[in-house]
C-alpha cells in the first residue's frame, strides 16, 4: 500500500500547487487605496444611484407609482429596489455578478419589468426579444436590461439619464 502512496505523491503535490496558484490568482491583494475611506465612498455611490432613481421615478407626476410592501434589499453581490409603476413592477439592481458577466454589457445597473403578480408575462417577454442578447442578463428567473450610467457626469445627471432610459424602456414595453 505504501508504494501506491509514493506513486501518487507527485500528482498530489502538483494538484496542491495548482490549487494554491488558483487561490493566489483569484485574490487581488489589497492596496492602501483599497483600504481608504475614499474607496468606501466610491462603493457607496452605486447604492445611492439606485436609491435616487427610485426617488426620481416616485416623484414623477406622469407615473402612477407605489412602494407599498416593497423594501430595499442588499445581498452579497449587490442591491435591489422595486417600484410599482403603472401596470408594471420595476426592479432596479446594482449587481456585481451581472456587471462581470463576459456575455453582456459591462454595466453595474440593470432593470427588470414584470406585472403586479411579479411575473414576466408573455407580452413583456416578447418585447424583451427585441433587444440583442448582450443587452440581456438572465438572473432570478427574469430578464434584465442594462441601465448604462453616464461617465464623467454629476450624480444628478447620471440619475436623470438613467430615469430617461427607464422611461424609454417603459414606452417600448407598453407599445402594442
Please annotate each region the language model reported.
Residues 4-35:
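A conserved mid-domain beta-alpha-beta active-site/ligand-binding segment of alpha/beta enzyme cores
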Residues 25-150:
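Polyanion-binding interface signature
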Residues 151-176:
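Long, solvent-exposed, polar/charged low-complexity segments
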Residues 18-21, 52, 56, 127, ...:
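Residues that form generic nucleotide/phosphate-binding pockets
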Residues 1:
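Catalytic cores of nucleic-acid endonucleases
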Residues 11, 20, 39-40, 72, ...:
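Short linear sequence motifs
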Residues 4-6, 12, 49-50, 90, ...:
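Extended aliphatic helical segments
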Amino acid at each position: 500500500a505504501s508504494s501506491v502512496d509514493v506513486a501518487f505523491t507527485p500528482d498530489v503535490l502538483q494538484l496542491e500547487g495548482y490549487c494554491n496558484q488558483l487561490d493566489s490568482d483569484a485574490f487581488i491583494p489589497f492596496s492602501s487605496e483599497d483600504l481608504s475611506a475614499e474607496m468606501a465612498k466610491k462603493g457607496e455611490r452605486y447604492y445611492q444611484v439606485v436609491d435616487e432613481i427610485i426617488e426620481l421615478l416616485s416623484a414623477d407626476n406622469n407615473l402612477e407609482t407605489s412602494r407599498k410592501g416593497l423594501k430595499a434589499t442588499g445581498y452579497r453581490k449587490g442591491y435591489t429596489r422595486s417600484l410599482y409603476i403603472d401596470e408594471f413592477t420595476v426592479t432596479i439592481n446594482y449587481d456585481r455578478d451581472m456587471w462581470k458577466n463576459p456575455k453582456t454589457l459591462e454595466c453595474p445597473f440593470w432593470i427588470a419589468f414584470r406585472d403586479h403578480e411579479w411575473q414576466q408575462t408573455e407580452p413583456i417577454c416578447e418585447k424583451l426579444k427585441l433587444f440583442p442578447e448582450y443587452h440581456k442578463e438572465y438572473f432570478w428567473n427574469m430578464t434584465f436590461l442594462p441601465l448604462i450610467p453616464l461617465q464623467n457626469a454629476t450624480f444628478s445627471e447620471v440619475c436623470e439619464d438613467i430615469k430617461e432610459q427607464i422611461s424609454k424602456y417603459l414606452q417600448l414595453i407598453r407599445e402594442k
